[in-house]
Amino acid sequence: MAATGGGAEDESRSGRSSSEGECAVAPEPLAEAGGLFSFADLGAALGSGAGLPGRAVGRAQSPLRYLQVLWQQDVEPRDELRCKIPAGRLRRAARPHRRLGPTGKEVHALKRLRDSANANDIETVQQLLEDGADPCAADDKGRTALHFASCNGNDQIVQLLLDHGADPNQQDGLGNTPLHLAACTNHVPVITTLLRGGARVDALDRAGRTPLHLAKSKLNILQEGHSQCLEAVRLEVKQIIHMLREYLERLGRHEQRERLDDLCTRLQMTSTKEQVDEVTDLLASFTSLSLQMQSMEKR
C-alpha cells in the first residue's frame, strides 16, 4: 500500500500519468550546478548502465531516457531543455539524400529550363533558376540550357545562367562547349559574355578544334559564297572581327588586336563586294597566322 501510495504521490507531483509513456516526460531539473550534462558522464553512464550523475538518490534517469527527452520537440515550458535542431542544419543534412536522384517534378523543371532557354523565354528561365533548378543539368545528348542559349545568341539568358552557376566549359556529347557553339554561329555578345564568365579559349572539341578554328571555317564559307548581298557579308565579317578581338584580348595579344582594329576600320570604308572580299581574305590570312602561332607555342 505504501508503494502504491508513493507511486500515486509521484504521479500527482509530476503532473502526469504513468500510462502516458516516457515520450511525454519532461526532464527533471538538475539538482545543482555540478549536475550539468556532459558527454563524458553520458559515455560512462552508457558503459555502466547506471543513471546520470549529479542527481538526487532515487531520481536517476537512464541515459536512453535522457537522450529521448533531450531531443524532444514539443517542449513548451521555458525552464525545460530546448534542443531542437536548427532548420538550416536539417536542410543541409537532408541534401545528400535528396541528391541521390531527382524527383519527377525536378526532372520536369530541368527539362523546362532547357526548353525555355532554347525558346528564348527569359522570364521562365529566371523563375526556374530562382526556384532552384540546376543550370548545369544536361539532356541525354549532354546539352545544357547554356548550350541552347549560346547557340541561339541570347546574351541575356547566357548571363542569367552564368550568374546562377552555369559552367561555361561544360561539354555536350560531341565535345562542344557553349563557346564553340557561339563561335560557330558568330554571336559576338555571347562570346564576350562567355569569355568574361570564365570560358576557356583553348578548349578543344572532339575533333580538336578551338573557337579560332571554327572562325576560320566560317571565313572559308564566306570566301566561297557568292549569293549573299554586300551588307550581309559585311555584317558577318564584322562579327568575326569582333569575336577574334575578344579572343586575342583574353590571350593578351595586344599587337594582333591592333591589326584587327585596322581591318575593322578598313571594312567600314568598303562600298563594293570586291572590297569586302579583300578584307575577308586578309582576315582569313590573319586567322591562319594566329593558328600557326598558337601551334608553335604549344610545342
Curated annotation (Swiss-Prot):
Query: Where would one find the signal peptide in this protein?
Result: none
Gene Ontology terms, cellular component aspect?
A: cytoplasm; midbody; nucleus
Which regions does the record annotate with the repeat ANK? 108-137, 141-170, 174-203, 207-239
PROSITE patterns from the entry?
Answer: ANK_REP_REGION (PS50297), ANK_REPEAT (PS50088)
Q: Which InterPro entries match?
A: Ankyrin_rpt, Ankyrin_rpt-contain_sf
Pfam family membership, one: Ank_2
Alphabetically, the GO molecular function entries are: protein kinase regulator activity; protein-containing complex binding
Q: Which UniProt keywords apply?
A: Acetylation, ANK repeat, Cytoplasm, Nucleus, Phosphoprotein, Repeat
Where do we find the motif Nuclear localization signal (NLS) here? 98-116
> Do you know which SMART domains this protein is assigned to?
ANK
Keyword Cytoplasm belongs to the record: yes
A Gene Ontology biological process in which this protein takes part is: regulation of intracellular signal transduction
Q: What does this protein do?
A: Plays an important role in regulating intracellular signaling events associated with erythroid terminal differentiation.
Subunit structure as annotated in this protein's UniProt entry: Interacts (via ankyrin repeat region) with LYN (via SH3-domain) in an activation-independent status of LYN. Forms a multiprotein complex with LYN and HCLS1. Interacts with TSN2, VAV1, DBNL and LASP1.
Which protein are we looking at? Ankyrin repeat domain-containing protein 54
- The organism is Rattus norvegicus (Rat)
Its gene name is Ankrd54
